[in-house]
Each structure stands twice: as C-alpha cells, then as structure tokens.
Amino acid sequence: SVGEAIRESGINRKDLFITTKLWNTDHGYDTTMRAFEHSMKLLGLDYLDLYLIHWPNPIKFRDCWQKANAGSWKAFEELYRAGRIRALGVSNFLPHHIDALMETAEIAPMVNQIRLCPGETQDAVVSYCREHHILVEAYSPMGTGKIFKVPQMTALAEKYQRSVAQICIRWSLQMGFLPLPKSVTPARIAENAQVFDFELDEADVAMNASLKGCCGESRDPDQILF
C-alpha cells in the first residue's frame, strides 16, 4: 500500500500531499462514506490531504446528480471536520455544477481539478473559480502526445533551451494554475520540477493560450456517457 511504502521509505507523511477521488458510481452520502473507508484501507493511510468528487454528472446519476452530489458533499464535510481529509474539492465541475452544490453545502470546494493545457484554457470555469476563491488544478498540463509535435511548442523549447514539457508546466504556472504533470520516470519527474528558474515572455504565454485544439478539447461532462 501507499502507507506501507511511505513507512518503509522513512519519508515524513507530513512532507507528502496525497489526493484521491470519489468514483462515479459512489455518489450519495452512504456510498461516499463506504468508498472513502475502502480507499483508506487500500492506501493504508489515516488521512488524505485532498479528496475530490471526480465527475459532476455521472451517467448513473444523470437524473438526480444534484441530490447525489449534495449527499457526497455532506460526507466530505463530515470527513473534513473529523480531520480525515485536510482539503475537499471537485474535478471536472462547471460553474452550474458548483452553484448547485452550494445550495446545500456549508463548506465551499477548495479545489477544482480540470483539464488545462496550451490551447485549452476553459476561461469561464477558471474565472468562476477565481471569483469564488477555488484553486484551479490543471490535469493533463501537457495535453496529449500531440503537443510535442506542435511547431510553436518546439520553437519555444528551443528559444528557452527547455523541454516542451517544461514549457507547458511553466505556462500553466504563469496562467495561475497548479499543474499536475504525470510521469513514472525519475529523470522526467526531476525535469518537470525544474521550472522555477525561468519565465516565459507575456507574448509567449498568450500564444500558448491561443493554440486552440492543438491537444484536443474538453468534452461537456453533462453529455459524456461516463
């Protein structure tokens, strides 16, 4: 388990930030509580740093997603007050999903994790989150593998003497997002962290944002059969 690996590593648990998500079929108060305990058992942990509702409108709850989310969020709030989770948030939520959640919520989401990468800026969602003091986490900050073949991105990598991945991550930071790059390769993990000793010019930040569709586009969570 993750907890066992942490103990064997000698790393202080407080130095790690661990997130997991509530799966689509587990919405509702009781099922959320059971799903949380199951996750904690699998992880071998006493608490989570962040717990997220993965999807706002799963196909299973398409006709009652507001009620299902409200039940899940009540469970989240209780777990938060009990110290089992240190922060609570959502993922792939659009403004109307959060508005519906806040009709019954006592604690606002602290995080909204959404797909953000060059050419995919989700301006309306980001503006809403900033207005409501919700941290925007960017998953897939490098989009898809297509980003590494986009001429503008390779040109920027050459200009700044960095990798395309580093350009993407740096862009995300300068856009005010918290990027979540994924890798299992130690060298790439180290490289992805080496983005705090340079900055992109404002024109290059804007150019990256304008590359609409270069890595595909996010789909409407209310329409996906997921």
Positions of PLM-derived features:
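Short, acidic/polar
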Residues: 28-43, 94-99, 120-121
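CE4/NodB-like, metal-dependent polysaccharide N-deacetylase domain
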Residues: 32-53, 78-82
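Beta/alpha (TIM)-barrel catalytic core signal, keyed to glycine-rich beta->alpha loops juxtaposed to Asp/Glu
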Residues: 55-218, 222-226
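Local beta-strand N-terminus motif with an aromatic residue
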Residues: 15, 45-48, 85, 109
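Acidic (Asp/Glu)-rich catalytic clusters
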Residues: 3-13, 40-46, 101-105, 126-132
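N-terminal binding-site loop/beta-alpha segment at the start of enzyme catalytic domains
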Residues: 1-16, 33, 71, 143, ...
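Active-site mouth loops of central-metabolism enzymes
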Residues: 22-30, 60-65
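A short, structured active-site edge motif that brings together acidic residues
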Residues: 13-26, 47-56, 116
